[in-house]
């Protein structure tokens, strides 16, 4: 019988964001696939989780993804964790989930903190209808094309940006989208 891939949300700043269920699942699975094992070991040590860990990240997602699917098909239960938040949201976990669905492997969520939803709820912007854009492309033409698509968007737009690109991105948003409300959220749960 095939194993299950568990998408376990991890804290987005405060270790107390971790759910009891996520801790239990991480203790019970056979293997943890982590975006950055150096970062994840701190989380696992904090919760005294001894489960073996392997890396799964942007630069090995295809090759390692196939290996993980093979293990899952052989009956291994695997938890996927990201550095912060929910795997599959703006990270390589999306690719592994696709591979699992194609192979007929069960994928289940162990929900918890997600930066996009947390930011939306504290932003003061409309929450009834929203669009999530993740990170804008780094390629100038691709980025401008996405911004042009966003011009006619009437819903609240949630997006991520790296601190070193924030000012430039805000300038691009103002130039392209005009007069709109903006909320900047960071360090969402560290207190």
Tell where the protein language model's regions lie, with residue ranges.
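Glycine-rich, flexible N-terminal cofactor/catalytic loop recognition
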Residues: 1-59
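Short phosphate-binding loop-to-helix
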Residues: 58-73, 92
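Short active-site oxyanion
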Residues: 26-32, 104-108, 156-157
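Short glycine-rich anion-binding loops that position phosphate/pyrophosphate groups of nucleotides
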Residues: 12-15, 83-87, 163-165, 190
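Beta-strand/loop-alpha-helix module characteristic of Rossmann-like adenine-cofactor folds
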Residues: 2-3, 114-191
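Conserved helicase motor
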Residues: 54-63, 135-140
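Short glycine-cluster motifs
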Residues: 74-133
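Loop/turn-to-beta-strand initiation segments
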Residues: 3-5, 74-79, 156
